[in-house]
């Protein structure tokens, strides 16, 4: 950043360089905090793990050290197979309900790869109608819609491709699974 750069940007594009740089830096700081919180949640998640394959009719049984892969032998479309992911999500949601005694999962965070599968499942409702003028853009995690009117779906481009984080967010502060409370906040 130089004074000349700021003057040129203002003269040619009518933009305030300081405001633009501050905005970008704020977004990056916000992204870092979001990723730190998501990492904390992924490491603390205790409802369990389910294994699922995107390959049609392929079952993976997680038996600890290594999974057993088997072909199921029934035939369906790829879209119908993608719907079986919903069963796995619901199973973990019910475990969360058992553990919290408050409710099942009501949000999920996934990678864009898993997001593509979820967006193709009947029951997914996108938050945007595709109008770029109405859309809001930011770095990192974005709410993209809901699944079956039950789960808010967030896409995280930095998330491991084959993982989904499910969580329950209650209506009160004490109904949360984690609290991010840094002793010295960023000024």
Predicted regions and their residues:
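Conserved P-loop NTPase motor cores
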Residues: 77-78, 101-106, 110, 119
């Amino acid at each position: 950043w130089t004074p000349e750069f700021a003057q040129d940007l203002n003269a040619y594009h009518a933009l305030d360089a300081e405001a633009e740089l501050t905005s970008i830096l704020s977004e990056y700081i916000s992204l870092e905090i979001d990723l730190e919180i998501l990492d904390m949640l992924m490491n603390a998640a205790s409802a369990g793990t389910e294994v699922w394959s995107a390959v049609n009719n392929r079952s993976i049984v997680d038996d600890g050290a290594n999974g057993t892969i088997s072909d199921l032998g029934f035939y369906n479309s790829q879209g119908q197979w993608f719907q079986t992911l919903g069963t796995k999500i619901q199973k973990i949601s019910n475990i969360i309900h058992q553990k919290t005694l408050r409710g099942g999962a009501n949000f999920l965070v996934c990678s864009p790869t898993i997001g593509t599968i979820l967006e193709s499942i009947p029951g997914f409702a996108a938050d945007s109608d595709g109008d770029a003028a109405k859309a809001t853009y930011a770095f990192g995690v974005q709410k993209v819609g809901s699944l079956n009117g039950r789960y808010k779906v967030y896409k995280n481009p930095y998330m491991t491709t084959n993982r989904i984080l499910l969580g329950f967010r209650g209506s009160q502060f004490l109904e949360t699974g984690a609290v991010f409370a840094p002793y010295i906040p960023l000024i």
